[in-house]
Each structure stands twice: as structure tokens, then as C-alpha cells.
Amino acid sequence: MNQTCKVCGEPAAGFHFGAFTCEGCKSFFGRSYNNISTISECKNEGKCIIDKKNRTTCKACRLRKCYNVGMSKGGSRYGRRSNWFKIHCLLQEHEQAAAAAGKAPPLAGGVSVGGAPSASSPVGSPHTPGFGDMAAHLHHHHQQQQQQQVPRHPHMPLLGYPSYLSDPSAALPFFSMMGGVPHQSPFQLPPHLLFPGYHASAAAAAASAADAAYRQEMYKHRQSVDSVESQNRFSPASQPPVVQPTSSARQSPIDVCLEEDVHSVHSHQSSASLLHPIAIRATPTTPTSSSPLSFAAKMQSLSPVSVCSIGGETTSVVPVHPPTVSAQEGPMDLSMKTSRSSVHSFNDSGSEDQEVEVAPRRKFYQLEAECLTTSSSSSSHSAAHSPNTTTAHAEVKRQKLGGAEATHFGGFAVAHNAASAMRGIFVCV
């Protein structure tokens, strides 16, 4: 590259952080810029010499020199460039060498680099101005002319960049050596035109454009997600379609009709049971059988406590017939009739239970009255009657009370007389 590092003087590796630097100074500036607090103050009051040998002795002076040569964190990092960039560097070196020598090298046609004819007198004669003086004079004159003219790009000075020349060939690197007036150096151009695509402003603009596009995409995606969520929230949930199993064998039309009838019957029964919960009986259901049940079995189903003291009393159970529905009633009245019939059956069952509970008491009081009358009559005629008559009365009483019969509960024969049976019923009730 034939460029030296502006900090330590070592051969430069590229254009880093706004200046030509070597790899060591580039890395040092990148590390030190973010960790300035770790760098201690200079012990030599900032008078250290930074060169290739002792550049690592004082970090404070080295960082100060990096700032002095124009390095900054916002500067572009171009790194190693191609051949055309090296040509620019060679041109700059040539100009620097010519300015340092103070004379212009003559060309083949007797014309100097600045465009003025070379004199036959020696190069160092006092009558012939040097190349540096002539270039400075012409450059100052051209700047005055440029200030008098209206700038073609008035917005560039506001951004901190030098204004362009009126000549469009000034922006080209090789035309600066062809005219009679030393045009503006290509290194005085704005950085975004000198190296397009690598400048910090161009990178920032590209990053902002990419960020804007990303935000727009995320906004659209969020809108679509919100619309889907609101639609699922406020719309009824769609039930999954019921897949009916298809039989491998082909069914006949008669089988299909039978299956539809069975399905309709089951669906009607299930809907009736779901829509009419009042039809459920609150009382335990009585088993229906062809033979009449005994009173003891009835009481066992109703109250298990009274089974232990129930005697041989047997009563006939009044059969409960379900309400009949006429064939002329429509299907809409079926639910109404079902609920009413269930209410009536509930009331009837309650009245039957009350009747069953009252019947033993009533019979007990009747038998007590008969026993009292019989005992009074037997006491008045006890002297006149024989023991055979007494046994006959006892037999009649036993038959009335039904004590001679035995009732089976769970395989055991329980025989009680009328008095013990009635006493047990009275206590349990």
C-alpha cells in the first residue's frame, strides 16, 4: 500500500477509524475507546514519543495521538483496498514528495506537472517559482473564484462536507494532473462519494431502512395474529364433524331403515330424560310382581329399622298403574303429560305410604278395644265358664291377631303373638 501508520509510523494495513493505521494501532484504538477508564494518566506529562519501538510504553499518549490524527469510533473501517485505491495512495505520495522537494519534475514535452512551460534556466533559479509556491497561489486563486460562484450543491456545506467544484472532471482521480490548475484532490471529496458503500452514514442509512422494514413486517404479523385471536374469541367454537363409520359390507335398504328407527327411538328417549328431570321419582320404586307382597316386605323396603319388630301382619299392596296416554295426543304434549303424571304418581305414592303407616295403628287400637271388652266380659263370667271356654276365647283372639302364622324374612321363621307384634310396631313408629 506504501502508506505508513499515522500513529506509530509502521506500514499501514488499511484505512481504519478514519485514518491510515497499522493493525496494532487499529486494535489498540478499538479496545481503548470502550475502556477509557482503564487507561492511566501519563507519567511524563503527555510528552511521550510514540513510534514503532515505544508505542506500547504509554497508552495515554498513544490514544491522544490517535485522536490527533483523526481517528474516531464513528469513522469508517475500510481495511485493505484494491489496486485503484493504491493508485490514489501513490498519487498522494507523489504530491507530498513534490511539495517537500520544492520543485516540479519536468516532463518529456517540456511542460511541468502544473501545466506551465518549463524554462531553460536551471530548476533552482530565483526567477522560476517552485512547484509548491505556484500550486499554493493557483489554489488560493481558484478558491476565491469558487466562493464567488453559486455552489451547485448548497446542502453539502450544511452537512460539514466541502462544496464541489464547478468542473465535473474534478471528482475524477486522474484529471487533477491534466489541467493547468491543480484541481481538488480526490481525498478532499466527501467520504460517502470517495468510498461508496463503506461509509458510516451509508451503513447507518441501510441499517435504518432494514429496521423500518423489519418493524413494518412485525406490525403486519401482529395485526394478523390479533385478528385471528379476536375471531376465535368472539366466534362460537366450531364442533368437529362427526365421522360416521362406513361398513365394508354393503347393507340392504331394510337394514338401513331398521338402524334409523333404532337411532330415532334412542335419541327420543335420551332427550326426554334430559329435558324432563322432574319425572325422576323421589321415593324408592316398588318392585312389580304378579304375586302380592306382604306388609313386612313393604316395610322392609321403606324402613329397615322396623323389620326387626314386625310381626306376622300381611297387607295387600295397592298396585300403582302408570297413567295411560291416549293415542290421539301429539308428540308435543307428551312431555307435558309425562311431567304431570310423574307429579301425580309422586303424590299418590306419598298417600299410600301414609296409609300404610296409619293402618297398623288403627288396627292396634281396634284390637285393644276388643281385648278390653273381652276381658271385662270374661271377668264377669269367669266363675260360670269352664276352662274350655277360656281356651276357646284365647284361640279366637290368636286367630284375630294372626299370631299363629309365621312370616319368613331372609330364610328365618319369625313367629310373634299379636301383642308383641303391635308393641314393636308402636315403638318403631
From Swiss-Prot:
GO terms for molecular function: DNA-binding transcription factor activity; DNA-binding transcription factor binding; DNA-binding transcription repressor activity, RNA polymerase II-specific; estrogen response element binding; nuclear receptor activity; zinc ion binding. The gene is kni. Transcriptional repressor. Binds to multiple sites in the eve stripe 3 enhancer element. Plays an essential role in the segmentation process both by refining the expression patterns of gap genes and by establishing pair-rules stripes of gene expression. It comes from the Eukaryota. This is Zygotic gap protein knirps. A zinc finger (NR C4-type) spans 5-25, 42-66. Residues 225-237, 338-349 have a biased composition (Polar residues). Residues 2-78 bind DNA. Signal peptide: none annotated. The lineage of its organism: Eukaryota, Metazoa, Ecdysozoa, Arthropoda, Hexapoda. Its main location: nucleus. Belongs to the nuclear hormone receptor family. NR0 subfamily. One of its GO terms (cellular component) is chromatin. Keywords: Developmental protein, DNA-binding, Metal-binding, Nucleus, Receptor, Repressor, Transcription, Transcription regulation, Zinc, Zinc-finger.
